[in-house]
């Protein structure tokens, strides 16, 4: 800054600026001239100052933004990789990557030294000096006092009392407009005229439509021009910001300013850019509004506001002699381009709106005073004509009136009328002789423009209209009227919502928010006119365009009459004649009166055809040109990318075309509902179709005569209807298709999308073709009245002839005199058109967005009408030429013609023929036919090449238009076509084309080839020759003839639904929808209902394409022959090149086709089973085949996947797939708005949103549960199948889970799960980008990153009460149901014979897992049982005795709770986890005959000896191994005798029993093991690390471990009395110690070997340890502190947190935790949302288990424990004991384990007394059950 030249420094504050515009802006803001109008405060406070450089800012967001410039470092660009030194430089650089349409085009700031700004920056004398040389405003207007007649102006004193006593001369001026000279000179300072123009001159201007309405609004104009003396600044700016001190004149400005202080993170919903305050976000959102209608006539720059255009044009002041920009046009009143103004330079007077259109509808050409007898009773305003008064009265009809052509909300009928007028401005038309007919500009406008060109600086800052309350001045009177609303304070309530506002302006701004909702609402008719028919009804805007030579007065008058169909806000408005203004009480009277205006209309209503217009509508992005604006609209939607969300179902789309296609599906459902209500009467259907045809013709022609239909009938509707067909061209080519598609688009939206509704489409097409019998008058100007009343064709107005005003009388007469008006949607008939208009809002319209501006419309005709206001773009010279037959793209016309002659034999076609016309029209602008447009895939290709800079020099991909295949080079595509054309021999099917030409024959060949490919999967030359059988020919329904392309441009018709297509490839693609069945993907096991869905699946999952070839109902997708249908011969390849050479004959092809067409469900199931059996291989073979598939995909990617990602190198067949994939590289923080979950890229967010948005269509027929995807339903239905069949019919687990990990042996059902799992083996240094934590593998990092999102999910096994774990393999499950299904898998595996395992069955494996790998995740289902090892030697099997028993042991020992032993007896009976938490145990298989002998006394309610131990096992029935059930026997409950077919059912039954469970420390009794475990933590948290032998306490478990090892060396065994402590920490042993406070949900057991490779066997404990060699192989990650090993590095990292001991306080509560893992688990109690709410009391809980426990509170009976002293009942023992203490009875609970007196409970069963210290906890005699499973 210090090096800036002193010439650019501010003279007041000495600040330096890099450019003169910034200095000028600085002086305007901080150092304004003291006499400048709208004077700012002397100094604007800048309270936010940078601490490093001292720079000050007014807003905190500016300071935050500025501070980024001081952050030094290395900031790389994620798009191009360029590095920057600070974030601000990176932010500025990122704008260069933004799409061109979103960049802000800022006009250059006006320089201070230029003379044209002196009116703004240099103070002039006053407003009086501007208006006159020596007079003020009062003196200038003094002359109006002389006229005594006050009817010429409204009574000023009757309005608001703020008018001064205006002189007579001013009244004269208000009564009559000045002449041209006075009008021009009266504004300049050089004249001495004493007259000032009272109103701006009526001419074309850029005055906004809202200002036009406000000029005539209900707020009376109360004296605009005030004296120049403005009130002091402190009085003007009454509203002061309390934070920064900035003052404002209006409360709304202060409210807007306060948004800059709302600091936070505000992301943009379109580009996800984040901002620090709301104001910055609001300003940024304007960048996405791409609406820049103001074009500079000298250069190609466009601007958003007229002010910007004014400032920019001042730079061209010295360049007037240069040729102006010919391609652009003048902005018109509505802000769009006006071709009629091309020859006129927009003057400042035109741009600033000083020439205003009179809303009364006439021009006052003289200054003579006229009689004004018509006075408004509400405001006193007078008019000369009754029609003007009628028009004015509409301004008092307040309400919400939405415009049907744009998103504007208007507040009275007059405003709507004035606004609609802007959409129907006359544009440059075609006269009778073909010459452009431009309406002559009025002399007044020409002279005014000439005067201002001479002195351009006179009116730049002329603001004669000043507010008397705040002093603010405006250029336009309408702006002042609009501003005065802000001073109308009070309480204004919105009529659409309960919000209230302090002034009228705030209310009106708020109402705009309801724009979209009000437009789409069904009850909008109660508040305004039907939104989608307001502008389509009047014929006179079209008439005004057809009569460009009429007088301007007539144009204005006719526009007024055209929009004079009063939109009734309350449905009680009077009926007004739009011609003479008379009012009638009912519609019948108005109808009779309208007949009087109908004379003399027929002479002026002849129709004549017009010349075919040139292709004047060119796409600015790709240069493609069209004849009609609607075609360009459809095309532009393919370039509109972003995040478009559906308001109905919250789905998101990335192109506007995709969203619009989706929205039609919602409209289709609504249309079907209305048609069902209408009934099936034939008469109603005929009336419906006739009305629809009439509506379609009128809506099509009412768009305007500037783009009439060609002879070919090309229309935007046809283009719209074809947009969604992939591979189809975008324009219709016949009148029949046009009408059918138009009607389908307008009134039966969505029906054309459904393949099953083709019959209705055919019926609609036939009906419309019968009704539309006008072969030569497609371009005629049919009016709406004609279509409704049956006006003869000879009454239609001529296109090039001026029409008199009497035609509107005939139009209105015809409209009112119609016999019956029928709704095209529901068939209801109405006697009058007004009834139909009122009824139309009952059918919600669609949504159509303009591709050039953000406006939306309710109907396609409205969009077409709006689009005329946009100037069509110019065709670029480098436009590619696309061949519609094969998809090849050529850079020049010569190459395209050569290709057409050589490849398609189209030498006989003329240049003006159908196919040639498209490209010829680009340069010659006069084609004779309307050709097909580009394929949708080619459009995506063009867009992709513009986005990716690396593809600038690359050639276009070549797409075959018949089969859809894409080729990198032209040679490949030519060879592809040669292989097709070589099959045109005598042995191919007889073509019904006749002599249509070789081009059509080749299309048919391609179609036949693709059909055979889709049936047999082995397409090629042979198939194109052999596959053309009779069924295939019939299915195509190809129409023949010499001129096939001209007479029937859509020859390919589906014989099932009747839908027609231009290209055979489109029909082939469509027919896959009808090939239904269960199409099962062999790789990912997903099932699809039809071939089209399966093909889409293959497109998105490239790994599936390289899988094993399939048979049965799994056909391959056309054009992508990776998967084949039908058996593959040996040696066959799955590549398309080899498929062409080998395949079945003609009979086999037809047979396969018939099988695909009609295949019974039984056959489908049989073939499906065969496929499953054939594709199921052994687990060892799957990994090589996966690798082979990957290599095959990579090989094919080089030839058939031309679209590769430049970031990761992944390739795709279609450009759209690549665009979709590239979203995965758009990294950042993307939050879900529904659940606030965060994602790192857009693709993840998009996939996640489907969870919330997608409907759950697939419902289970047995339980009613619904799912989003079919595969989810299939997975769910397996549960029902297993329960019904007992698992006997299911195949081995390995077949269900064919994907095995080569490193750890884990198996998965889906390949994606295996890929996801492999990340856990990718070790390295992975750091979290959010926090400084590092992880050793990618899976651990991914799991960790979930913690940073707001919605933290608990992972399985981490939950305290809800997660359950399998004791056999250690896998965790979220609930008992999942565990039961998992246990059945173990059960089935155990029933199979142990092949090669030496007799070791599942029981031994289960117990081995209990010993060696308890709690760890092992391979599920397909894993081999791990044999139990003792001293490194496998033990073949010990079925009669548990293998975990030692040789000298007499009692079996499960894993003790402390993982140690005390005196040879296990301390606890549950599974020990690492933290010492209690893991209750459940019996998995309690299958036993009813007569089996119970050797253990632990049964029912009298388990007394082993009570404290076995009560935790939840009805654990100990029995002999000999009493085990054989496979096939039933399981019976030992308590109630109930039998079950499966052990899981018995497990669920036993879990629900109210058995007693005791705490080992205090002998408290509980009803379930979960409560017991929860209670045990209270003891753990309250005690320290104490030695059970000597009682010495230690600070950490390491010290205790060392101390216990010292005890072990001194004693050969631990005395049996040690178990008296009943301390869960009392686990002893040299090699394993588990201490309290180390977490509660670990995935590994507490058993710890002494050291790596050391095998320890305790003499008295009899515990066998698996060999460390095998353990090291399976568990390579070992903890260095305690020696525990894990399979995954993430598990080890998670475990190591348990060693970080100390006091870790919770930040949300005063609780202290002993280690990080406990703190992490505890923090979930605060952060996890409480999703489970009680339906009775509303209390919320984190888990379903807690809600279930809470539900017992509301149960009728509280529990089995009844207090003998009071009637209370208790469900839990602890509650009962605590209650007893209140009664001071003799039973108390001793904390040291004192016995509790028995209390009589439910059933009078005595409670077992707690064990005494001298009683051993376990009887050494009973045997352990054969198969155990533990769960939480």
From Swiss-Prot:
Residues 912-922 have a biased composition (Acidic residues). GO terms for molecular function: DNA-binding transcription factor activity, RNA polymerase II-specific; RNA polymerase II cis-regulatory region sequence-specific DNA binding; zinc ion binding. InterPro entries: Znf_C2H2_sf (IPR036236), Znf_C2H2_type (IPR013087). SUPFAM superfamilies: beta-beta-alpha zinc fingers. The keyword Transcription regulation applies. GO terms for biological process: regulation of DNA-templated transcription. Keywords: DNA-binding, Isopeptide bond, Metal-binding, Nucleus, Phosphoprotein, Repeat, Transcription, Transcription regulation, Ubl conjugation, Zinc, Zinc-finger. The modification Phosphoserine is found at residue 612. Residues 26-47, 94-200, 313-346, 660-810, 901-931, 1103-1148, 1274-1294, 1377-1481, 1509-1529, 1606-1672, 1781-1832 are annotated as: Disordered. The keyword Metal-binding applies. Residues 1460-1475 have a biased composition (Gly residues). Residues 313-329, 735-767, 1378-1393, 1427-1438 have a biased composition (Basic and acidic residues). GO terms for cellular component: nucleus. Changing residue 1337 to I: In a breast cancer sample; somatic mutation. Coiled coil: none annotated. Residues 798-810, 1406-1417 have a biased composition (Polar residues). A zinc finger (C2H2-type) spans 8-31, 48-70, 75-97, 239-261, 266-288, 294-316, 374-396, 401-424, 465-487, 492-514, 575-597, 617-639, 644-666, 821-843, 848-870, 881-904, 958-980, 1052-1074, 1079-1101, 1203-1225, 1230-1252, 1258-1280, 1299-1321, 1326-1348, 1364-1386, 1557-1579, 1585-1607, 1677-1699, 1704-1726, 1732-1754, 1761-1783. Pfam families: zf-C2H2, zf-C2H2_6. Residues 94-108, 661-678 have a biased composition (Basic residues). Belongs to the krueppel C2H2-type zinc-finger protein family. May be involved in transcriptional regulation. This is Zinc finger protein 646.
């Amino acid at each position: 800054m210090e090096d800036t030249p002193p010439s650019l420094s501010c003279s007041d504050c000495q600040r330096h600026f890099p450019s003169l515009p910034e200095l000028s802006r600085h002086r305007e803001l901080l150092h304004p001239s003291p006499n400048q109008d709208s004077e700012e405060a002397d100094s604007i406070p800048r309270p936010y100052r940078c601490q490093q450089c001292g720079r000050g800012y007014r807003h905190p967001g500016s300071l935050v933004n500025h501070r980024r410039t001081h952050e030094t470092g290395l900031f790389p660009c994620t798009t191009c990789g360029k590095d920057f030194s600070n974030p601000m430089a990176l932010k500025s650089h990122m704008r260069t990557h933004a799409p061109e349409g979103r960049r802000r085009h800022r006009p250059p700031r006006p320089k201070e030294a230029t003379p044209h700004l002196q009116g703004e920056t240099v103070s002039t004398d006053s407003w009086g000096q501007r208006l006159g040389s020596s007079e003020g405003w009062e003196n200038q207007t003094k002359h109006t006092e002389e006229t005594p007649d006050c009817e010429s102006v409204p009574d000023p004193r009757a309005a608001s009392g703020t008018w001064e006593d205006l002189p007579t001369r001013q009244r004269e001026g208000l009564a009559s407009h000045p002449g041209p000279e006075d009008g021009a000179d009266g504004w300049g300072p050089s004249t001495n005229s004493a007259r000032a123009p009272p109103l701006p001159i009526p001419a074309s201007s850029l005055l906004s439509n809202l200002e036009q309405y406000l000029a005539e609004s209900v707020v009376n104009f109360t004296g605009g021009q005030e004296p120049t003396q403005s009130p002091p600044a402190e009085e003007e700016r009454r509203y002061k910001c309390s934070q920064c001190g900035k003052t404002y004149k209006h409360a709304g400005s202060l409210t807007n300013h306060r948004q800059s202080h709302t600091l936070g993170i505000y992301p943009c919903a379109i580009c996800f850019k984040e901002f620090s305050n709301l104001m910055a976000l609001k300003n940024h959102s304007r960048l996405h509004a791409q609406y820049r209608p103001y074009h500079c006539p000298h250069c190609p720059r466009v601007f958003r506001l007229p002010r910007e255009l004014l400032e920019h044009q001042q730079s061209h002041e010295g360049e007037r002699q240069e040729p102006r920009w010919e391609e652009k046009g003048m902005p018109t009143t509505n802000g769009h381009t006006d071709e009629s103004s091309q020859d006129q330079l927009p003057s400042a007077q035109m741009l600033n709106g000083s020439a205003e259109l009179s809303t009364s509808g006439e021009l006052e050409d003289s200054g003579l005073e006229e009689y004004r007898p018509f006075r408004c009773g509400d405001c006193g305003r007078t008019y000369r004509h009754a029609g003007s008064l009628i028009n004015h009265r509409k301004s008092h009809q307040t309400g919400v009136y939405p415009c049907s052509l744009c998103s504007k909300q208007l507040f009275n009928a007059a405003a709507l009328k004035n606004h609609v007028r802007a959409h129907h401005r006359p544009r440059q038309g075609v006269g009778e002789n073909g010459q452009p007919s431009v309406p002559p500009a009025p002399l007044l406008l020409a002279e005014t423009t000439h005067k201002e060109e001479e002195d351009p600086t006179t009116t730049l800052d002329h603001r004669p209209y000043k507010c008397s309350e705040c002093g603010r001045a405006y250029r336009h009177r309408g702006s002042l009227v609009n501003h005065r609303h802000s001073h109308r304070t009070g309480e204004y309530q919105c009529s659409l919502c309960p919000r209230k506002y302090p002034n009228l302006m705030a209310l009106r701004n708020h109402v705009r928010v309801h724009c979209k909702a009000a437009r789409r609402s069904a009850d909008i008719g109660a508040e305004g006119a039907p939104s989608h028919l307001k502008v389509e009804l009047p014929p006179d805007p079209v008439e005004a365009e057809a009569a460009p030579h009429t007088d301007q007065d007539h144009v204005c008058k006719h526009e007024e009459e055209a929009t004079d169909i009063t939109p009734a806000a309350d449905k009680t408005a009077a009926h007004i004649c739009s011609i003479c203004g008379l009012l009638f009480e009912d519609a019948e009277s108005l109808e009779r009166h309208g007949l009087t205006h109908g004379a003399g209309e027929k002479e002026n209503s002849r129709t004549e055809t017009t010349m075919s217009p040139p292709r004047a509508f060119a796409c600015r992005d790709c240069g493609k040109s069209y004849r009609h604006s609607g075609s360009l609209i459809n095309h532009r939607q393919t370039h509109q990318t972003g995040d478009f969300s559906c308001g109905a179902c919250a789905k998101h789309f990335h192109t506007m075309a995709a969203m619009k296609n989706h929205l039609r599906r919602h409209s289709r459902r609504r249309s079907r509902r209305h048609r069902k209500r209408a009934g099936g009467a034939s008469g109603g259907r005929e009336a419906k179709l006739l009305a629809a045809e009439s509506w379609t013709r009128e809506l099509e022609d009412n768009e305007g005569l500037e783009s009439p239909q060609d002879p070919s009938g090309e229309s935007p509707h046809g283009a719209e209807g074809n947009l969604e067909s992939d591979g189809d061209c975008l324009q219709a080519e016949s009148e029949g298709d046009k009408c059918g598609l138009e009607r389908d688009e307008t009134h039966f939206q969505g029906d054309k999308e459904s393949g099953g509704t083709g019959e209705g489409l055919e019926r609609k097409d036939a009906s419309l073709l019968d009704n539309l019998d006008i072969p030569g008058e497609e371009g005629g100007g049919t009016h709406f009245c004609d279509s409704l009343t049956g006006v003869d064709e000879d009454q239609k107005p001529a296109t090039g002839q001026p029409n008199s005003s009497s035609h509107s009388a005939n139009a209105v007469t015809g409209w009112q005199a119609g016999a019956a008006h029928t709704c095209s949607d529901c068939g209801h008939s109405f006697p009058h058109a007004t009834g139909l208009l009122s009824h139309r809002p009952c059918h919600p319209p669609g949504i159509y967005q303009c591709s050039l501006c953000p406006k939306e419309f309710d109907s396609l005709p409205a969009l077409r009408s709006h689009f005329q206001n946009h100037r069509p773009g110019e065709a670029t010279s480098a436009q590619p030429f696309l061949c519609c037959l094969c998809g090849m793209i050529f850079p020049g016309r010569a190459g395209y013609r050569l290709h057409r002659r050589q490849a398609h034999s189209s030498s006989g076609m003329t240049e003006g023929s159908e196919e040639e016309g498209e490209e010829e029209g680009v340069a010659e602008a006069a084609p004779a036919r309307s050709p097909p447009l580009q394929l949708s895939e080619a459009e995506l290709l063009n867009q992709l090449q513009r986005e990716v800079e690396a593809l600038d020099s690359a050639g276009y991909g070549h797409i075959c238009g018949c089969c859809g295949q894409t080729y990198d080079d032209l040679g490949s595509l030519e060879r592809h076509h040669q292989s097709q054309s070589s099959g045109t021999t005598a042995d191919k099917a007889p073509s019904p084309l006749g002599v249509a030409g070789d081009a059509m024959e080749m299309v048919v060949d391609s179609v036949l080839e693709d059909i055979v490919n889709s049936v047999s999967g082995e397409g090629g030359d042979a198939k194109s020759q052999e596959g053309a059988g009779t069924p295939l020919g019939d299915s195509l329904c190809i129409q023949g003839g010499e001129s096939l392309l001209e007479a029937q441009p859509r020859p390919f018709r589906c014989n099932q639904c009747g839908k027609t297509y231009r290209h055979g490839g489109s029909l082939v693609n469509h027919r896959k929808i009808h090939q239904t069945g269960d199409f099962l993907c062999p790789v990912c096991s997903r099932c699809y209902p039809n071939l089209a869905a399966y093909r889409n699946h293959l497109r998105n999952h490239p790994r599936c394409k390289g899988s094993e070839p399939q048979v049965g109902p799994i056909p391959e997708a056309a054009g992508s022959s990776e998967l084949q249908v039908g058996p593959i011969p040996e040696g066959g390849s799955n590549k398309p090149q080899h498929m062409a050479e080998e395949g079945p004959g003609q009979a086999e092809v037809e047979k396969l086709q018939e099988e695909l067409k009609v295949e019974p469900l039984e056959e489908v199931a049989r073939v499906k089973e065969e496929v499953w059996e054939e594709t199921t291989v052994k687990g060892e073979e799957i990994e090589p085949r996966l690798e082979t598939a990957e290599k095959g995909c990579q090989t094919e990617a080089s030839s058939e996947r031309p679209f590769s990602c430049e970031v990761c190198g992944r390739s795709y067949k279609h450009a759209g797939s690549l665009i979709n994939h590239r979203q995965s590289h758009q990294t950042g923080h993307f939050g879900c708005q529904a659940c606030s979950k965060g994602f790192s890229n857009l693709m993840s967010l998009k996939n996640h949103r489907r969870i919330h948005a997608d409907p759950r269509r697939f419902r289970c027929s047995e339980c009613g549960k619904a799912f989003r995807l079919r595969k989810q339903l299939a997975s769910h239905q397996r549960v029902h199948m297993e329960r019904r069949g007992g698992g006997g019919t299911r195949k081995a687990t390995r077949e269900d889970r064919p994907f095995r990990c080569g490193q750890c042996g884990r198996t998965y059902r889906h390949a994606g799960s295996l890929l996801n799992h492999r990340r856990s083996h990718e070790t390295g240094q992975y750091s979290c980008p959010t926090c400084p934590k590092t992880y050793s593998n990618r899976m651990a990092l991914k799991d960790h990153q979930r913690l940073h999102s707001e919605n933290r999910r608990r992972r399985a096994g981490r939950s305290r009460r809800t997660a359950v774990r399998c004791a056999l393999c250690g896998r965790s499950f979220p609930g008992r149901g999942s565990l039961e299904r998992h246990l059945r898998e173990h059960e089935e595996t155990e029933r199979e014979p142990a092949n090669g395992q030496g007799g070791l069955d599942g029981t031994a494996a289960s117990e081995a897992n209990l010993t060696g790998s308890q709690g760890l995740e092992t391979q599920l289902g397909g894993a081999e049982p791990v044999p139990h090892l003792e001293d490194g030697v496998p033990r073949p099997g010990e079925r009669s005795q548990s293998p975990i028993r030692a040789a000298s042991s007499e009692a079996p020992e499960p894993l003790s709770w402390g993982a140690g032993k005390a005196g040879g007896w296990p301390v606890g009976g549950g599974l020990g986890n690492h933290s010492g938490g209690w893991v209750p145990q459940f019996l998995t298989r309690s299958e036993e005959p009813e007569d089996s002998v119970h050797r253990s006394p632990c049964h029912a309610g009298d388990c007394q000896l082993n009570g404290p131990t076995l009560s935790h096992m939840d009805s654990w029935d100990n029995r002999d191994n000999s009493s085990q059930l054989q496979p096939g026997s039933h399981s019976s409950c030992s308590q109630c005798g109930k039998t079950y077919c499966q052990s899981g059912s018995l497990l669920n039954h036993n879990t629900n029993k109210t058995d007693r469970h005791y705490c080992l420390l205090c002998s408290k009794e509980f009803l379930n093991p979960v409560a017991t475990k929860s209670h045990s933590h209270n003891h753990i948290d309250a005690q320290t690390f104490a030695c059970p032998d000597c009682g010495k306490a230690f600070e950490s478990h390491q010290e205790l471990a060392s101390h216990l090892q010292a005890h072990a060396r001194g004693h050969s065994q631990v005395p049996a009395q040690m178990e008296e402590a009943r301390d869960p920490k009392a686990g002893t042993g040299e090699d394993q110690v588990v201490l309290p406070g180390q977490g509660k949900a670990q995935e590994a057991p507490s058993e710890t070997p002494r050291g790596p490779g050391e095998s320890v066997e305790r003499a008295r404990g009899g515990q066998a340890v698996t060999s460390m060699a095998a353990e090291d192989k399976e568990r390579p990650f070992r903890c260095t502190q305690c020696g525990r090993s894990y399979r995954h590095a993430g598990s080890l990292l998670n475990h190591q947190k348990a060693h970080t001991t100390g006091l870790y306080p919770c930040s949300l509560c005063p609780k202290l935790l002993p280690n990080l893992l406990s703190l992490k688990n505890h923090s979930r109690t605060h952060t996890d949302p409480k999703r489970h709410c009680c339906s009775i009391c509303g209390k919320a809980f984190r888990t379903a288990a807690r809600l279930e426990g809470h539900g017992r509170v509301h149960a009728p009976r509280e529990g089995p424990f009844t207090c003998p002293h009071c009637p209370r009942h208790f469900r839990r023992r602890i509650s009962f004991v605590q209650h007893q203490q209140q009664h001071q009875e003799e039973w108390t609970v001793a904390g040291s384990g004192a016995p509790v007196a028995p209390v009589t409970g439910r059933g009078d069963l005595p409670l077992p007394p707690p064990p005494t210290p001298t009683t051993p906890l376990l009887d050494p005699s009973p045997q352990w059950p054969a198969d155990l499973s533990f769960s939480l």
